[in-house]
């Protein structure tokens, strides 16, 4: 009888220990989940748009890099969102918005060897600069990076380029990002009227990220800022309900999406570590003016001027690969 009581007592103690351990583990998991949520919230707050009107995106470390063949097998928004797109929570993207096979069949190639310019580079946010930019030096801003891209296209590829250095986010001696797209549009339309041969529009920006994020890779031995292709979907996410924005009509939306996809996949095949996932937001930005319109983010505020300018070498190669007919 005593042995039975001892066994029951031991069993009871074991059960109690198991319960205590289970509760402790459960509390640990709850604390871990809470800390992770807080970290995400903290990072989101830290990632608030610094001095740029465009979004902040800290790249996730995906091991798998999408290429043309793997992209063709992606049919769901979940797959596309994992490997190709980063969809901002303010945007409502539908599976019908993206047809990979259709997009990859679009032919964007042009004869870029003509004497008349086919490419326009401009900067809706001309005042964006970098961590080591010298105050007052245009060469150290995104405009200087755009100038370097233009030089590469002209000197290395023989492609005529128009580089617009208009300051659409600088008014009355101050940086004013609000309304910069509305200021940019009539000025850029005048350039298109002056150069009707232009068919490719590149709105070049740099992103804004927390101070501990450095969007850099190495290409051919050079420290190189990562790039990100950017699309506006002209549809808001209204608490899970799609809200179209007819006042921001973009007749070239599918062309824009197809072009950024081709550029992104080409980048992955030529320079696997260069491109961040394509960012999707509402609105239309500067992408409604031409079918071959693109918005490209070059690095961020934590990159150096050298890193940003180094990114123009592979970017030019990617552009020519996708857009040049022969």
Predicted feature locations:
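N-terminal Sec-pathway targeting helices
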Residues: 1-15
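N-terminal, intrinsically disordered, polar/charged segments of Gram-positive cell-envelope systems
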Residues: 24-112
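Solvent-exposed loop/turn segments at secondary-structure junctions
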Residues: 126-129, 167-170, 206-211, 233-237, ...
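Catalytic-core regions of hydrolytic enzymes
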Residues: 134-217
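A short, glycine/acidic-enriched catalytic loop
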Residues: 210-248
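Active-site-adjacent substrate-binding region
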Residues: 251-279
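Active-site-adjacent mobile loop/cap segments within catalytic or ligand-binding domains
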Residues: 273-326
């Amino acid at each position: 009888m005593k042995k039975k009581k001892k066994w029951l007592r031991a069993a009871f103690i074991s059960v109690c220990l198991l319960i205590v351990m289970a509760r402790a583990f459960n509390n640990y998991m709850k604390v871990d989940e809470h800390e992770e949520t807080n970290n995400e919230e903290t990072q989101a707050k830290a990632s608030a748009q610094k001095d740029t009107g465009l979004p902040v995106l800290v790249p996730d470390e995906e091991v798998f890099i999408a290429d043309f063949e793997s992209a063709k097998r992606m049919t769901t928004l979940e797959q596309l969102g994992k490997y190709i797109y980063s969809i901002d929570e303010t945007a409502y993207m539908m599976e019908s918005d993206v047809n990979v096979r259709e997009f990859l069949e679009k032919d964007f190639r042009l004869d870029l060897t003509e004497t008349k310019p086919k490419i326009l580079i401009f900067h809706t946010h001309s005042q964006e600069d970098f961590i080591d930019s010298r105050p007052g030096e245009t060469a150290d801003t995104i405009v200087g990076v755009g100038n370097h891209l233009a030089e590469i296209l002209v000197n290395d590829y023989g492609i005529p380029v128009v580089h617009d250095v208009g300051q659409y986010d600088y008014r009355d001696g101050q940086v004013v990002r609000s309304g910069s797209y509305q200021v940019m549009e009539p000025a850029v339309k005048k350039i298109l009227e002056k150069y009707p041969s232009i068919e490719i529009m590149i709105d070049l920006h740099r992103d804004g990220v927390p101070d501990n994020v450095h969007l850099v890779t190495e290409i051919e031995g050079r420290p190189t800022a990562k790039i990100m292709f950017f699309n506006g979907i002209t549809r808001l996410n209204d608490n899970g309900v799609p809200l179209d924005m007819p006042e921001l009509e973009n007749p070239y939306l599918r062309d824009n999406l197809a072009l950024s996809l081709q550029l992104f996949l080409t980048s992955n095949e030529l320079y696997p570590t260069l491109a961040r996932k394509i960012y999707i937001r509402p609105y239309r930005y500067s992408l409604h003016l031409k079918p071959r319109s693109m918005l490209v983010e070059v690095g961020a505020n934590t990159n150096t001027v050298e890193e940003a300018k180094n990114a123009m070498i592979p970017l030019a190669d990617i552009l020519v690969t996708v857009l040049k007919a022969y």
